[in-house]
């Protein structure tokens, strides 16, 4: 699961990121609405945790804007506003749940997991672009109903490309997903992984579906 944490407090944002990563999830952390918009469009998170007190845009405004643009992912709000009127406003804006500050991170984790369980019955766990199919729960790629054996990194790349079908995904974006720690990133690693992934796909589907867009990144597109 990929989680987007939108929180301007650097220390709290770090603690949330560490806890969520320790639970086995991928995390993108944004300090403001502008950065949150970038991660929303580039990485397509499964759930967002949003603080209302952002420096460049009120969190409620951000949530309303996302919902008006048909962004349907579950949203958990962090807020210091405690009145029932404030809570009604949060939910009316489009949030699915909220946690009031101060809070224990364990409560945030529990509510996040509850939202994902609730949402799993509504959201499709399969991305289907015949003959390609990605099973999000099993983390498997199938071509013509044949499961392709991929490493964890190869699967992450494939899922990202298919989620962005018809759109160029930058190498930097892929690197960030594979290696959250900047010290571990090496640009040639993506080239090696992409080469292996292409070979595995072409063994089942000879037509080229992943192309390199020079100076921009990679594109998955069925022709």
Curated annotation (Swiss-Prot):
GO molecular function, one term: identical protein binding
Domain of life of the source: Bacteria
Pfam families with a match to the protein in the record: Response_reg, Trans_reg_C
Modified residues (4-aspartylphosphate): 51
SMART domains named in the record: REC (SM00448), Trans_reg_C (SM00862)
Biological processes per GO annotation: positive regulation of DNA-templated transcription; regulation of DNA-templated transcription
Keywords: Activator, Cytoplasm, DNA-binding, Phosphoprotein, Repressor, Transcription, Transcription regulation, Two-component regulatory system
Induction of expression: The phoP/phoQ operon is positively autoregulated by both PhoP and PhoQ in a Mg(2+)-dependent manner, inhibited at high Mg(2+) concentrations. Induced by dsbA disruption and dithiothreitol.
Disruption phenotype: Altered expression of 33 genes; 9 are down-regulated, the rest up-regulated.
Any one cellular-component term (Gene Ontology): cytosol
Modifications made to the protein after synthesis: Phosphorylated by PhoQ.
Regulation: Feedback inhibited by MgrB, which seems to bind PhoQ, altering its activity and that of downstream effector PhoP. PhoP-regulated transcription is redox-sensitive, being activated when the periplasm becomes more reducing (deletion of dsbA/dsbB, or treatment with dithiothreitol). MgrB acts between DsbA/DsbB and PhoP/PhoQ in this pathway.
Residue ranges constituting the Response regulatory domain according to the UniProt record: 2-116
DNA-binding region (UniProt annotation): 124-222
Localisation: Cytoplasm
PANTHER family (UniProt xref): REGULATOR OF RPOS, TRANSCRIPTIONAL REGULATORY PROTEIN PHOP
Miscellaneous comment in the UniProt entry for this protein: There is a close linkage between the Rcs and PhoQ/P signaling systems, and both signaling systems respond to certain external divalent cations (zinc and magnesium).
Quaternary state and interactors: Monomer in the inactive, unphosphorylated state and dimer in the active, phosphorylated state.
Function recorded in the entry: Member of the two-component regulatory system PhoP/PhoQ involved in adaptation to low Mg(2+) environments and the control of acid resistance genes. In low periplasmic Mg(2+), PhoQ phosphorylates PhoP, resulting in the expression of PhoP-activated genes (PAG) and repression of PhoP-repressed genes (PRG). In high periplasmic Mg(2+), PhoQ dephosphorylates phospho-PhoP, resulting in the repression of PAG and may lead to expression of some PRG. Mediates magnesium influx to the cytosol by activation of MgtA.
Protein name, per record: Transcriptional regulatory protein PhoP
